């Protein structure tokens, strides 16, 4: 069911945004719950089997380190997968815009689709779509490079690697290790990326919707003028004159 006032494509934007938001929260909750249960079980076993001996207690606790490390690694990998899914949501919706609004897409690379849409809009309507510049920069540069790193394991251009790691070094929620590893350390980073993409998508959809609405109004006015002309100047009946 489409929310009142939403286009089909806007409903898709909102629905998929909601699903991804829920996935971010749900996966984090599951791993955190699992980790807490492991820690509590480790503490219980250590207390029950150490007879108050401090060293024995900590030896038993340390035996669970591998389990905790595995849980942490799984959560880290899950965040990488989720980030790639979030970026895919963005690119998929851009392609949906091209189909839905019948936009002439001259992009030869996925990274050029947004620019192609913005140029097509300006050519057709003589106006620019004003998206938040920082969001567009993050989407086309930082987030795209991070997605490419996660998907391919490395970046082919040293320039891209330097750009990505410069961004990552000053971005909350990311940790860098060496010259080729970036870890998403918390969910806030995922939510920020998701909100960034949604903001761009809504901005584009609102612009096209407004223009289509204006075109519909002009069409209705034209129909009213024709109807009024017919009422005021009815055609002559055959046989008269």
Task: List the predicted regions and their residue ranges.
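Flexible secondary-structure boundary motifs
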Residues: 80, 84, 88-187, 191-195, ...
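Extended intrinsically disordered or low-complexity regions, especially N/C-terminal cytosolic tails and loops
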Residues: 1-84, 134-138, 162-241
């Amino acid at each position: 069911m489409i929310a009142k006032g939403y286009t089909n494509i806007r409903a898709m934007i909102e629905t998929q945004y909601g699903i991804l938001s829920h996935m971010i929260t749900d996966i984090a909750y599951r791993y955190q719950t699992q980790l807490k249960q492991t820690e509590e079980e480790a503490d219980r076993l250590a207390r029950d089997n150490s007879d108050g001996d401090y060293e024995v207690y900590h030896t038993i606790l340390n035996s669970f380190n591998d389990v905790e490390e595995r849980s942490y690694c799984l959560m880290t990998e899950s965040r990488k997968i989720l980030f790639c899914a979030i970026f895919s949501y963005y690119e998929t919706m851009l392609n949906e815009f091209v189909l839905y609004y019948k936009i002439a897409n001259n992009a030869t690379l996925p990274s050029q689709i947004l620019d192609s849409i913005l140029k097509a809009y300006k050519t057709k309507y003589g106006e620019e779509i004003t998206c938040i510049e920082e969001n567009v920069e993050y989407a086309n540069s930082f987030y795209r490079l991070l997605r490419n790193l996660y998907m391919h394991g490395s970046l082919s251009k040293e320039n891209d690697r330097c750009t990505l790691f410069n961004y990552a070094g000053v971005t909350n929620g990311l940790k860098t290790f060496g010259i080729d590893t970036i870890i998403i350390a918390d969910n806030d980073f995922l939510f920020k990326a998701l909100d960034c993409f949604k903001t761009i998508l809504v901005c584009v959809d609102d612009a096209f919707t407004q223009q289509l609405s204006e075109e519909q109004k002009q069409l209705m006015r034209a129909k009213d003028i024709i109807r009024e002309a017919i009422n005021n100047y009815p055609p002559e009946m055959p046989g008269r004159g």
